[in-house]
Amino acid sequence: MGCLLDMKKYVNEELDSKIYIENNVYKRLLMIQKERVKLETGGIIIGYYDEDCRNAIITECTNPPKDSIATRKCFLRGVKGLKSLLKKKWNEKNEYYLGEWHLHPGASPQPSITDIFQMKKIENNPKFNCQEPILLIVGEKYNNFEISLILFKNNKQYFYIESEP
């Protein structure tokens, strides 16, 4: 694990919890947004929780699996290769699935109704083994890079706000 001071920090005061994004992951998301990609893209979030299980550390936002479907306003994440990747991450680093990420090209990073519905399905589906999934959306506001981070917990949504390290 890198030093938490070298990561982007997002805070939710209601839950008294934080989500940290490793700088290399943050820079990669920034590059994807700057490239002005025309189609939505995305993947899964990999990382871990600290000892208190209160703060999440995001170590990777994967590329889209090869069987994903991307259009201008929709991204359907595929599954090809994810099972073996997650097994490898768990065995090598004790890292695991934390949630989903995707890009809203040229648009706000606020979650759509579809985004919220999909995350609630993940939260309540035992196959995902993720009762508190994180949704990370990359977008822009006033032509500036912006990330929305939402934790889904007990059928509620908790938004995280960027904070100083």
Where are these regions (language model features)?
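Histidine-centered divalent metal-coordination motifs
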Residues: H102-H104
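Conserved beta-strand-loop surface patch within small alpha/beta domains used
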Residues: M1-Y97, G106-P165
